[in-house]
Curated annotation (Swiss-Prot):
Keyword terms: Cell cycle, Cell division, Cell membrane, Coiled coil, Membrane, Septation, Transmembrane, Transmembrane helix
Coiled-coil segments: 102-141, 274-350, 459-520
Subcellular location: Cell membrane
Positions in the Cytoplasmic compartment: 27-574
TM region positions: 8-26
Protein name: Septation ring formation regulator EzrA
GO biological-process terms attached to the record: division septum assembly; septin ring assembly
Pfam families: EzrA
Membrane topology classification: Single-pass membrane protein
Length: 574
Protein backbone atom coordinates (compact mmCIF):
# COMPACT_ATOMS: atom_id res chain seq x y z
CA UNK A 1 0.00 0.00 0.00
CA UNK A 2 1.41 3.23 -0.97
CA UNK A 3 2.28 5.88 1.59
CA UNK A 4 -0.19 8.31 0.07
CA UNK A 5 -3.09 6.04 0.74
CA UNK A 6 -1.90 5.50 4.27
CA UNK A 7 -1.73 9.23 4.91
CA UNK A 8 -5.23 9.68 3.52
CA UNK A 9 -6.63 6.98 5.79
CA UNK A 10 -4.90 8.53 8.79
CA UNK A 11 -6.29 11.94 7.91
CA UNK A 12 -9.81 10.56 7.60
CA UNK A 13 -9.54 8.80 10.94
CA UNK A 14 -8.31 11.98 12.59
CA UNK A 15 -11.18 13.96 11.09
CA UNK A 16 -13.69 11.39 12.33
CA UNK A 17 -12.19 11.50 15.83
CA UNK A 18 -12.21 15.30 15.86
CA UNK A 19 -15.81 15.39 14.58
CA UNK A 20 -16.86 12.95 17.26
CA UNK A 21 -15.16 14.94 19.98
CA UNK A 22 -16.78 18.16 18.74
CA UNK A 23 -20.17 16.40 18.67
CA UNK A 24 -19.72 15.15 22.23
CA UNK A 25 -18.81 18.65 23.44
CA UNK A 26 -21.81 20.25 21.68
CA UNK A 27 -24.16 17.59 23.02
CA UNK A 28 -22.93 18.16 26.59
CA UNK A 29 -23.35 21.88 26.22
CA UNK A 30 -26.91 21.38 24.91
CA UNK A 31 -27.64 18.96 27.75
CA UNK A 32 -26.56 21.67 30.16
CA UNK A 33 -28.82 24.24 28.47
CA UNK A 34 -31.75 21.81 28.43
CA UNK A 35 -31.23 21.04 32.14
CA UNK A 36 -31.16 24.78 32.89
CA UNK A 37 -34.39 25.30 30.96
CA UNK A 38 -36.02 22.41 32.80
CA UNK A 39 -35.00 23.95 36.12
CA UNK A 40 -36.43 27.35 35.06
CA UNK A 41 -39.68 25.63 34.07
CA UNK A 42 -39.89 23.84 37.40
CA UNK A 43 -39.10 27.05 39.30
CA UNK A 44 -41.88 28.90 37.47
CA UNK A 45 -44.33 26.08 37.99
CA UNK A 46 -43.41 25.96 41.68
CA UNK A 47 -44.32 29.64 42.26
CA UNK A 48 -47.25 30.01 44.80
CA UNK A 49 -49.60 31.39 42.18
CA UNK A 50 -52.32 28.86 43.05
CA UNK A 51 -52.14 29.87 46.71
CA UNK A 52 -52.37 33.53 45.79
CA UNK A 53 -55.35 32.82 43.54
CA UNK A 54 -57.11 30.94 46.34
CA UNK A 55 -56.36 33.79 48.77
CA UNK A 56 -57.88 36.38 46.44
CA UNK A 57 -60.81 34.05 45.66
CA UNK A 58 -61.57 33.85 49.39
CA UNK A 59 -62.13 37.64 49.46
CA UNK A 60 -65.45 37.12 47.65
CA UNK A 61 -64.85 39.78 45.07
CA UNK A 62 -67.79 41.39 43.35
CA UNK A 63 -68.39 43.52 40.32
CA UNK A 64 -65.46 44.69 38.22
CA UNK A 65 -62.96 43.24 40.67
CA UNK A 66 -64.51 39.80 40.28
CA UNK A 67 -64.40 40.07 36.46
CA UNK A 68 -60.75 41.09 36.53
CA UNK A 69 -59.94 38.20 38.86
CA UNK A 70 -61.60 35.70 36.54
CA UNK A 71 -59.58 36.97 33.59
CA UNK A 72 -56.26 36.62 35.42
CA UNK A 73 -57.26 33.23 36.82
CA UNK A 74 -58.09 32.00 33.32
CA UNK A 75 -54.74 33.25 32.08
CA UNK A 76 -53.03 31.21 34.79
CA UNK A 77 -55.05 28.15 33.83
CA UNK A 78 -54.01 28.63 30.20
CA UNK A 79 -50.38 28.83 31.23
CA UNK A 80 -50.51 25.68 33.33
CA UNK A 81 -52.55 23.67 30.83
CA UNK A 82 -51.11 24.84 27.52
CA UNK A 83 -47.89 26.78 27.88
CA UNK A 84 -46.16 24.52 30.39
CA UNK A 85 -47.22 21.39 28.39
CA UNK A 86 -45.93 22.89 25.16
CA UNK A 87 -42.65 23.82 26.84
CA UNK A 88 -42.36 20.28 28.16
CA UNK A 89 -42.85 18.86 24.65
CA UNK A 90 -40.21 21.17 23.16
CA UNK A 91 -37.74 20.24 25.90
CA UNK A 92 -38.38 16.53 25.20
CA UNK A 93 -37.91 17.10 21.46
CA UNK A 94 -34.67 19.00 22.09
CA UNK A 95 -33.33 16.15 24.20
CA UNK A 96 -34.07 13.61 21.46
CA UNK A 97 -32.50 15.73 18.76
CA UNK A 98 -29.45 16.36 20.90
CA UNK A 99 -29.02 12.66 21.64
CA UNK A 100 -29.09 11.89 17.90
CA UNK A 101 -26.51 14.59 17.25
CA UNK A 102 -29.04 16.70 15.36
CA UNK A 103 -27.53 19.78 16.88
CA UNK A 104 -29.01 22.41 14.57
CA UNK A 105 -32.62 21.38 15.20
CA UNK A 106 -31.81 20.78 18.86
CA UNK A 107 -30.46 24.36 19.13
CA UNK A 108 -33.62 25.67 17.47
CA UNK A 109 -35.78 23.83 20.01
CA UNK A 110 -33.65 25.12 22.90
CA UNK A 111 -34.03 28.70 21.66
CA UNK A 112 -37.79 28.19 21.25
CA UNK A 113 -38.11 26.84 24.82
CA UNK A 114 -36.09 29.76 26.17
CA UNK A 115 -38.35 32.25 24.39
CA UNK A 116 -41.46 30.51 25.70
CA UNK A 117 -40.08 30.51 29.25
CA UNK A 118 -39.37 34.23 29.01
CA UNK A 119 -42.96 34.87 27.90
CA UNK A 120 -44.36 32.63 30.63
CA UNK A 121 -42.17 34.31 33.22
CA UNK A 122 -43.52 37.73 32.16
CA UNK A 123 -47.11 36.45 32.19
CA UNK A 124 -46.73 34.95 35.65
CA UNK A 125 -45.26 38.23 36.95
CA UNK A 126 -48.24 40.11 35.47
CA UNK A 127 -50.69 37.63 37.00
CA UNK A 128 -49.10 37.87 40.45
CA UNK A 129 -48.95 41.67 40.28
CA UNK A 130 -52.61 41.84 39.25
CA UNK A 131 -53.60 39.45 42.05
CA UNK A 132 -51.68 41.56 44.55
CA UNK A 133 -53.39 44.74 43.31
CA UNK A 134 -56.79 43.07 43.60
CA UNK A 135 -55.94 41.93 47.10
CA UNK A 136 -54.73 45.36 48.24
CA UNK A 137 -57.67 47.13 46.62
CA UNK A 138 -60.14 44.78 48.25
CA UNK A 139 -58.47 45.13 51.62
CA UNK A 140 -58.56 48.92 51.23
CA UNK A 141 -62.22 48.89 50.23
CA UNK A 142 -62.99 46.53 53.06
CA UNK A 143 -61.21 48.82 55.52
CA UNK A 144 -63.20 51.83 54.22
CA UNK A 145 -66.46 49.97 54.56
CA UNK A 146 -65.49 48.68 58.00
CA UNK A 147 -64.48 52.19 59.13
CA UNK A 148 -67.71 53.71 57.86
CA UNK A 149 -69.80 50.98 59.49
CA UNK A 150 -67.88 51.36 62.75
CA UNK A 151 -68.62 55.08 62.75
CA UNK A 152 -72.28 54.41 62.12
CA UNK A 153 -72.52 51.72 64.81
CA UNK A 154 -70.73 53.89 67.39
CA UNK A 155 -73.04 56.79 66.56
CA UNK A 156 -76.07 54.53 66.83
CA UNK A 157 -74.89 53.22 70.22
CA UNK A 158 -74.14 56.74 71.48
CA UNK A 159 -77.58 57.99 70.47
CA UNK A 160 -79.28 55.00 72.09
CA UNK A 161 -77.38 55.49 75.35
CA UNK A 162 -78.10 59.23 75.51
CA UNK A 163 -81.56 59.29 73.99
CA UNK A 164 -82.96 61.34 76.88
CA UNK A 165 -80.44 64.12 76.22
CA UNK A 166 -81.65 64.94 72.71
CA UNK A 167 -85.08 66.27 73.61
CA UNK A 168 -87.24 67.34 70.68
CA UNK A 169 -84.46 66.58 68.16
CA UNK A 170 -84.80 62.80 68.56
CA UNK A 171 -87.30 62.29 65.68
CA UNK A 172 -85.06 64.24 63.30
CA UNK A 173 -81.99 62.31 64.47
CA UNK A 174 -83.82 59.01 63.86
CA UNK A 175 -84.73 60.24 60.40
CA UNK A 176 -81.12 61.13 59.62
CA UNK A 177 -79.94 57.73 60.89
CA UNK A 178 -82.41 55.96 58.58
CA UNK A 179 -81.17 58.04 55.65
CA UNK A 180 -77.59 56.99 56.39
CA UNK A 181 -78.70 53.36 56.69
CA UNK A 182 -80.36 53.67 53.28
CA UNK A 183 -77.11 55.00 51.82
CA UNK A 184 -75.22 51.97 53.13
CA UNK A 185 -77.84 49.72 51.49
CA UNK A 186 -77.40 51.59 48.20
CA UNK A 187 -73.63 51.10 48.48
CA UNK A 188 -74.01 47.34 48.88
CA UNK A 189 -76.42 47.14 45.94
CA UNK A 190 -74.22 49.21 43.63
CA UNK A 191 -71.07 47.33 44.63
CA UNK A 192 -72.76 43.98 43.99
CA UNK A 193 -74.05 45.09 40.60
CA UNK A 194 -70.55 45.93 39.43
CA UNK A 195 -70.65 49.73 39.71
CA UNK A 196 -67.72 50.42 42.06
CA UNK A 197 -67.35 54.11 41.14
CA UNK A 198 -70.89 55.12 42.09
CA UNK A 199 -70.76 52.72 45.05
CA UNK A 200 -67.64 54.53 46.31
CA UNK A 201 -69.40 57.90 45.97
CA UNK A 202 -72.38 56.62 47.94
CA UNK A 203 -70.05 55.25 50.63
CA UNK A 204 -68.32 58.64 50.84
CA UNK A 205 -71.67 60.38 51.31
CA UNK A 206 -72.74 57.89 53.96
CA UNK A 207 -69.49 58.40 55.85
CA UNK A 208 -69.73 62.21 55.57
CA UNK A 209 -73.32 62.19 56.79
CA UNK A 210 -72.36 59.90 59.68
CA UNK A 211 -69.53 62.21 60.75
CA UNK A 212 -71.70 65.32 60.39
CA UNK A 213 -74.54 63.78 62.39
CA UNK A 214 -72.03 62.65 65.02
CA UNK A 215 -70.74 66.20 65.38
CA UNK A 216 -74.30 67.50 65.66
CA UNK A 217 -75.30 64.94 68.29
CA UNK A 218 -72.23 65.88 70.36
CA UNK A 219 -73.47 69.48 70.56
CA UNK A 220 -77.19 68.92 71.02
CA UNK A 221 -77.17 67.71 74.69
CA UNK A 222 -75.62 70.97 75.93
CA UNK A 223 -78.24 73.01 74.06
CA UNK A 224 -81.08 70.77 75.24
CA UNK A 225 -79.78 70.88 78.83
CA UNK A 226 -80.00 74.66 78.71
CA UNK A 227 -83.54 74.59 77.34
CA UNK A 228 -84.92 71.78 79.49
CA UNK A 229 -82.96 72.14 82.74
CA UNK A 230 -80.85 75.27 83.21
CA UNK A 231 -83.27 77.91 81.94
CA UNK A 232 -86.37 76.49 83.69
CA UNK A 233 -84.42 76.13 86.94
CA UNK A 234 -83.18 79.70 86.71
CA UNK A 235 -86.68 80.97 85.94
CA UNK A 236 -88.14 79.05 88.88
CA UNK A 237 -85.44 80.53 91.09
CA UNK A 238 -86.20 84.02 89.78
CA UNK A 239 -89.95 83.68 90.23
CA UNK A 240 -89.55 82.30 93.75
CA UNK A 241 -87.16 85.10 94.63
CA UNK A 242 -89.46 87.68 93.06
CA UNK A 243 -92.43 86.56 95.16
CA UNK A 244 -90.29 86.55 98.30
CA UNK A 245 -89.02 90.06 97.57
CA UNK A 246 -92.58 91.30 97.04
CA UNK A 247 -93.54 89.84 100.41
CA UNK A 248 -90.62 91.75 101.94
CA UNK A 249 -92.02 95.02 100.54
CA UNK A 250 -89.61 95.29 97.61
CA UNK A 251 -90.72 97.41 94.68
CA UNK A 252 -89.19 97.57 91.24
CA UNK A 253 -88.84 100.32 88.63
CA UNK A 254 -89.64 97.71 85.99
CA UNK A 255 -93.39 97.09 85.96
CA UNK A 256 -93.34 94.23 83.43
CA UNK A 257 -91.38 91.58 85.32
CA UNK A 258 -94.22 89.00 85.23
CA UNK A 259 -94.57 89.56 81.49
CA UNK A 260 -90.82 89.13 81.06
CA UNK A 261 -91.01 85.77 82.86
CA UNK A 262 -93.71 84.66 80.42
CA UNK A 263 -91.82 85.95 77.37
CA UNK A 264 -88.70 84.04 78.38
CA UNK A 265 -90.69 80.81 78.84
CA UNK A 266 -92.24 81.28 75.41
CA UNK A 267 -88.78 81.85 73.93
CA UNK A 268 -87.56 78.63 75.55
CA UNK A 269 -90.49 76.67 74.09
CA UNK A 270 -90.02 78.25 70.67
CA UNK A 271 -86.30 77.51 70.58
CA UNK A 272 -86.93 73.94 71.69
CA UNK A 273 -89.44 73.51 68.85
CA UNK A 274 -87.10 75.05 66.28
CA UNK A 275 -84.27 72.81 67.43
CA UNK A 276 -85.82 69.88 65.51
CA UNK A 277 -84.35 71.44 62.35
CA UNK A 278 -80.87 70.84 63.85
CA UNK A 279 -79.90 74.45 63.12
CA UNK A 280 -77.51 74.52 66.06
CA UNK A 281 -75.98 77.94 65.36
CA UNK A 282 -79.41 79.57 65.49
CA UNK A 283 -80.33 77.57 68.62
CA UNK A 284 -77.12 78.57 70.41
CA UNK A 285 -77.60 82.20 69.45
CA UNK A 286 -81.16 82.16 70.77
CA UNK A 287 -79.96 80.44 73.96
CA UNK A 288 -77.47 83.27 74.41
CA UNK A 289 -80.27 85.83 74.06
CA UNK A 290 -82.42 83.92 76.56
CA UNK A 291 -79.54 83.77 79.05
CA UNK A 292 -78.96 87.50 78.65
CA UNK A 293 -82.62 88.21 79.43
CA UNK A 294 -82.47 85.93 82.48
CA UNK A 295 -79.25 87.61 83.61
CA UNK A 296 -80.87 91.02 83.26
CA UNK A 297 -83.63 89.91 85.66
CA UNK A 298 -81.01 88.64 88.11
CA UNK A 299 -79.33 92.04 87.84
CA UNK A 300 -82.63 93.79 88.62
CA UNK A 301 -83.17 91.72 91.76
CA UNK A 302 -79.54 91.91 92.87
CA UNK A 303 -79.55 95.66 92.31
CA UNK A 304 -82.60 96.11 94.55
CA UNK A 305 -81.21 93.76 97.22
CA UNK A 306 -77.90 95.64 97.27
CA UNK A 307 -79.77 98.96 97.21
CA UNK A 308 -81.87 97.88 100.20
CA UNK A 309 -78.76 97.37 102.33
CA UNK A 310 -77.36 100.78 101.46
CA UNK A 311 -80.72 102.57 101.66
CA UNK A 312 -81.59 100.94 105.01
CA UNK A 313 -78.27 102.07 106.46
CA UNK A 314 -78.63 105.58 105.06
CA UNK A 315 -82.25 105.85 106.25
CA UNK A 316 -80.99 105.50 109.82
CA UNK A 317 -78.03 107.80 109.35
CA UNK A 318 -79.83 110.58 107.44
CA UNK A 319 -82.08 111.90 110.29
CA UNK A 320 -79.14 112.01 112.69
CA UNK A 321 -76.88 113.64 110.15
CA UNK A 322 -79.58 116.15 109.23
CA UNK A 323 -80.12 117.07 112.89
CA UNK A 324 -76.36 117.46 113.35
CA UNK A 325 -75.99 119.74 110.33
CA UNK A 326 -79.08 121.70 111.36
CA UNK A 327 -77.64 122.30 114.85
CA UNK A 328 -74.38 123.41 113.31
CA UNK A 329 -76.24 125.85 111.11
CA UNK A 330 -78.18 127.30 114.05
CA UNK A 331 -74.97 127.73 116.01
CA UNK A 332 -73.33 129.34 113.00
CA UNK A 333 -76.28 131.71 112.52
CA UNK A 334 -76.17 132.70 116.18
CA UNK A 335 -72.42 133.26 116.05
CA UNK A 336 -72.70 135.40 112.93
CA UNK A 337 -75.56 137.37 114.52
CA UNK A 338 -73.49 137.97 117.66
CA UNK A 339 -70.44 139.06 115.70
CA UNK A 340 -72.53 141.24 113.41
CA UNK A 341 -73.43 143.45 116.36
CA UNK A 342 -69.77 144.44 116.73
CA UNK A 343 -68.31 143.76 113.31
CA UNK A 344 -69.17 144.52 109.74
CA UNK A 345 -68.99 141.03 108.16
CA UNK A 346 -68.81 140.04 104.52
CA UNK A 347 -72.21 139.30 103.01
CA UNK A 348 -70.76 136.03 101.72
CA UNK A 349 -71.00 134.33 105.09
CA UNK A 350 -74.61 135.35 105.65
CA UNK A 351 -75.66 134.35 102.15
CA UNK A 352 -73.84 131.03 102.46
CA UNK A 353 -75.55 130.23 105.77
CA UNK A 354 -78.92 131.07 104.19
CA UNK A 355 -78.10 128.71 101.31
CA UNK A 356 -77.25 126.02 103.86
CA UNK A 357 -80.56 126.63 105.59
CA UNK A 358 -82.39 126.27 102.27
CA UNK A 359 -80.66 122.95 101.51
CA UNK A 360 -81.46 121.67 105.00
CA UNK A 361 -85.11 122.73 104.63
CA UNK A 362 -85.42 120.97 101.27
CA UNK A 363 -84.07 117.72 102.73
CA UNK A 364 -86.39 118.04 105.73
CA UNK A 365 -89.40 118.51 103.48
CA UNK A 366 -88.60 115.95 100.78
CA UNK A 367 -86.45 113.23 102.32
CA UNK A 368 -86.67 113.17 106.11
CA UNK A 369 -90.15 111.64 106.25
CA UNK A 370 -89.15 109.03 103.66
CA UNK A 371 -86.14 108.02 105.74
CA UNK A 372 -88.11 107.91 108.99
CA UNK A 373 -90.82 105.73 107.41
CA UNK A 374 -88.40 103.64 105.36
CA UNK A 375 -90.15 100.34 106.00
CA UNK A 376 -93.48 101.66 104.69
CA UNK A 377 -92.21 103.08 101.42
CA UNK A 378 -93.61 101.88 98.09
CA UNK A 379 -90.68 102.99 96.00
CA UNK A 380 -87.85 100.84 94.66
CA UNK A 381 -84.93 100.72 97.05
CA UNK A 382 -82.62 101.71 94.20
CA UNK A 383 -84.53 105.01 93.89
CA UNK A 384 -84.45 105.49 97.66
CA UNK A 385 -80.72 104.77 97.61
CA UNK A 386 -80.18 107.52 95.04
CA UNK A 387 -82.40 109.92 97.01
CA UNK A 388 -80.65 109.25 100.32
CA UNK A 389 -77.17 109.38 98.81
CA UNK A 390 -77.98 112.67 97.07
CA UNK A 391 -79.27 114.12 100.36
CA UNK A 392 -76.26 112.84 102.31
CA UNK A 393 -73.94 114.32 99.70
CA UNK A 394 -75.76 117.64 100.03
CA UNK A 395 -75.45 117.51 103.82
CA UNK A 396 -71.76 116.64 103.49
CA UNK A 397 -71.24 119.68 101.27
CA UNK A 398 -73.24 121.82 103.71
CA UNK A 399 -71.18 120.60 106.65
CA UNK A 400 -67.96 121.26 104.76
CA UNK A 401 -69.20 124.74 103.89
CA UNK A 402 -70.19 125.34 107.51
CA UNK A 403 -66.66 124.47 108.59
CA UNK A 404 -65.29 126.93 106.04
CA UNK A 405 -67.59 129.71 107.27
CA UNK A 406 -66.84 128.87 110.88
CA UNK A 407 -63.11 129.01 110.13
CA UNK A 408 -63.65 132.41 108.52
CA UNK A 409 -65.57 133.95 111.48
CA UNK A 410 -64.08 132.14 114.46
CA UNK A 411 -60.90 134.29 114.43
CA UNK A 412 -62.59 137.65 113.94
CA UNK A 413 -62.15 138.65 117.58
CA UNK A 414 -58.59 137.37 117.54
CA UNK A 415 -57.96 139.42 114.41
CA UNK A 416 -59.23 142.53 116.19
CA UNK A 417 -57.19 141.81 119.32
CA UNK A 418 -54.06 141.11 117.28
CA UNK A 419 -54.61 144.26 115.24
CA UNK A 420 -54.90 146.38 118.40
CA UNK A 421 -51.76 144.80 119.81
CA UNK A 422 -49.89 145.35 116.55
CA UNK A 423 -51.08 148.96 116.43
CA UNK A 424 -49.68 149.66 119.89
CA UNK A 425 -46.39 148.05 118.94
CA UNK A 426 -46.16 149.91 115.62
CA UNK A 427 -46.92 153.30 117.24
CA UNK A 428 -44.16 152.68 119.76
CA UNK A 429 -41.78 151.62 116.98
CA UNK A 430 -42.62 154.78 115.03
CA UNK A 431 -41.68 156.96 118.03
CA UNK A 432 -38.48 154.95 118.58
CA UNK A 433 -37.50 155.37 114.92
CA UNK A 434 -38.07 159.11 115.22
CA UNK A 435 -35.91 159.32 118.37
CA UNK A 436 -33.25 157.14 116.72
CA UNK A 437 -33.03 159.54 113.79
CA UNK A 438 -32.95 162.61 116.07
CA UNK A 439 -30.04 161.18 118.07
CA UNK A 440 -27.96 160.94 114.87
CA UNK A 441 -27.76 164.77 114.65
CA UNK A 442 -27.89 164.68 110.89
CA UNK A 443 -27.68 167.94 108.87
CA UNK A 444 -31.18 167.18 107.65
CA UNK A 445 -33.66 164.36 106.96
CA UNK A 446 -33.85 162.96 103.39
CA UNK A 447 -37.11 163.58 101.60
CA UNK A 448 -37.74 159.89 100.81
CA UNK A 449 -37.41 159.04 104.50
CA UNK A 450 -39.84 161.80 105.48
CA UNK A 451 -42.33 160.56 102.87
CA UNK A 452 -42.07 156.97 104.15
CA UNK A 453 -42.32 158.12 107.77
CA UNK A 454 -45.46 160.19 107.29
CA UNK A 455 -47.05 157.52 105.06
CA UNK A 456 -46.51 154.94 107.79
CA UNK A 457 -47.92 157.32 110.36
CA UNK A 458 -51.01 157.86 108.19
CA UNK A 459 -51.50 154.13 107.80
CA UNK A 460 -51.31 153.62 111.56
CA UNK A 461 -53.85 156.41 112.05
CA UNK A 462 -56.17 154.74 109.50
CA UNK A 463 -55.92 151.45 111.40
CA UNK A 464 -56.56 153.29 114.66
CA UNK A 465 -59.63 154.98 113.18
CA UNK A 466 -61.01 151.67 111.92
CA UNK A 467 -60.55 150.05 115.32
CA UNK A 468 -62.32 153.00 116.95
CA UNK A 469 -65.58 152.55 115.02
CA UNK A 470 -68.77 151.33 116.66
CA UNK A 471 -68.91 148.33 114.24
CA UNK A 472 -65.55 147.27 113.05
CA UNK A 473 -65.02 146.28 109.44
CA UNK A 474 -62.86 143.26 110.13
CA UNK A 475 -61.81 142.88 106.50
CA UNK A 476 -60.57 146.48 106.47
CA UNK A 477 -58.81 145.92 109.80
CA UNK A 478 -57.05 142.83 108.42
CA UNK A 479 -56.00 144.68 105.29
CA UNK A 480 -54.81 147.81 107.14
CA UNK A 481 -52.97 145.70 109.70
CA UNK A 482 -51.08 143.91 106.94
CA UNK A 483 -50.27 147.23 105.24
CA UNK A 484 -49.03 148.72 108.54
CA UNK A 485 -46.85 145.68 109.20
CA UNK A 486 -45.17 146.01 105.81
CA UNK A 487 -44.84 149.81 106.16
CA UNK A 488 -43.20 149.74 109.59
CA UNK A 489 -40.77 147.05 108.42
CA UNK A 490 -39.86 149.09 105.31
CA UNK A 491 -39.44 152.23 107.42
CA UNK A 492 -37.11 150.40 109.78
CA UNK A 493 -34.97 149.20 106.88
CA UNK A 494 -34.92 152.69 105.36
CA UNK A 495 -33.90 154.19 108.73
CA UNK A 496 -30.91 151.89 108.99
CA UNK A 497 -29.92 152.64 105.41
CA UNK A 498 -30.11 156.44 105.86
CA UNK A 499 -28.09 156.37 109.07
CA UNK A 500 -25.52 154.01 107.55
CA UNK A 501 -25.07 156.18 104.45
CA UNK A 502 -24.72 159.34 106.54
CA UNK A 503 -22.26 157.83 109.02
CA UNK A 504 -20.08 156.21 106.33
CA UNK A 505 -20.10 159.41 104.26
CA UNK A 506 -18.81 161.43 107.22
CA UNK A 507 -16.06 158.89 107.82
CA UNK A 508 -15.03 158.76 104.17
CA UNK A 509 -15.03 162.55 103.87
CA UNK A 510 -12.64 162.73 106.81
CA UNK A 511 -10.50 159.93 105.35
CA UNK A 512 -10.29 161.72 101.99
CA UNK A 513 -8.21 164.49 103.59
CA UNK A 514 -5.20 162.21 103.00
CA UNK A 515 -5.52 162.62 99.24
CA UNK A 516 -7.20 165.97 98.68
CA UNK A 517 -3.95 167.96 98.55
CA UNK A 518 -2.42 165.98 95.69
CA UNK A 519 -5.39 164.19 94.04
CA UNK A 520 -7.52 166.64 92.13
CA UNK A 521 -10.19 164.02 91.55
CA UNK A 522 -10.55 163.34 95.25
CA UNK A 523 -10.73 167.08 95.96
CA UNK A 524 -13.47 167.56 93.37
CA UNK A 525 -15.48 164.60 94.66
CA UNK A 526 -15.01 165.81 98.24
CA UNK A 527 -16.54 169.18 97.42
CA UNK A 528 -19.44 167.60 95.51
CA UNK A 529 -20.09 165.00 98.19
CA UNK A 530 -19.96 167.62 100.94
CA UNK A 531 -22.58 169.70 99.15
CA UNK A 532 -24.84 166.64 98.70
CA UNK A 533 -24.36 165.81 102.38
CA UNK A 534 -24.88 169.21 104.02
CA UNK A 535 -27.15 171.03 101.58
CA UNK A 536 -29.25 168.41 99.78
CA UNK A 537 -29.13 165.80 102.55
CA UNK A 538 -28.80 163.10 99.89
CA UNK A 539 -26.62 160.77 101.93
CA UNK A 540 -26.79 157.91 99.42
CA UNK A 541 -25.55 160.06 96.54
CA UNK A 542 -22.90 161.66 98.76
CA UNK A 543 -21.66 158.21 99.83
CA UNK A 544 -21.54 156.99 96.24
CA UNK A 545 -19.58 160.08 95.12
CA UNK A 546 -16.84 160.04 97.75
CA UNK A 547 -16.52 156.21 97.85
CA UNK A 548 -16.01 156.08 94.08
CA UNK A 549 -13.24 158.74 94.26
CA UNK A 550 -11.44 156.96 97.08
CA UNK A 551 -11.67 153.59 95.34
CA UNK A 552 -9.74 155.01 92.40
CA UNK A 553 -6.77 155.89 94.61
CA UNK A 554 -7.14 153.20 97.27
CA UNK A 555 -9.12 150.15 96.12
CA UNK A 556 -11.00 148.30 98.88
CA UNK A 557 -11.18 151.24 101.23
CA UNK A 558 -15.00 151.42 101.08
CA UNK A 559 -15.50 147.77 101.99
CA UNK A 560 -13.18 148.19 104.94
CA UNK A 561 -15.24 151.07 106.32
CA UNK A 562 -18.55 149.25 105.62
CA UNK A 563 -17.42 146.10 107.42
CA UNK A 564 -16.22 148.09 110.38
CA UNK A 565 -19.49 149.99 110.58
CA UNK A 566 -21.66 146.86 110.43
CA UNK A 567 -19.78 145.39 113.38
CA UNK A 568 -20.39 148.45 115.57
CA UNK A 569 -23.75 149.63 114.23
CA UNK A 570 -26.24 150.75 116.86
CA UNK A 571 -29.68 149.13 116.61
CA UNK A 572 -33.02 150.77 117.30
CA UNK A 573 -34.13 149.77 120.77
CA UNK A 574 -37.86 149.03 120.43
Amino acid sequence: MSSGIILLIVAIVLLVIIAYLVGVIIRKRNDSLITSLEERKQALFALPVNDEIEEVKSLHLIGQSQTSFREWNQKWVDLTVNSFADIENHIFEAENLNDTFNFIRAKHEINSVESQLNLVEEDIASIREALNILKEQEEKNSARVTHALDLYEKLQASISENEDNFGSTMPEIDKQMKNIETEFSQFVALNSSGDPVEASEVLDRAEEHTIALGQITEQIPAIVAKLEDDFPDQLDDLETGYRRLLEENYHFPEKNIEARFQEIRESIRANSSELVTLDLDRAREENTHIQERIDSLYEVFEREIAAYKVAAKNSKMLPRYLAHVKRNNEQLKNEIARLSRKYILSETESLTVKAFEKDIKEIEDSTLAVAEQFGLQEKPFSELQVTFERSIKTLTNVESGQMDVFAAVKDIEKIESQARHNLDVYVTQLHMIKRYMEKRHLPGIPQDFLSAFFTTSSQLEALMDELSRGRINIEAVSRLSEVATVAIANLEDLTYQVVQNATLTEQLLQYSNRYRSFEAGVQSSFEHALRLFEVENDYQASFDEISYALETVEPGVTDRFVNSYEKTREHIRF
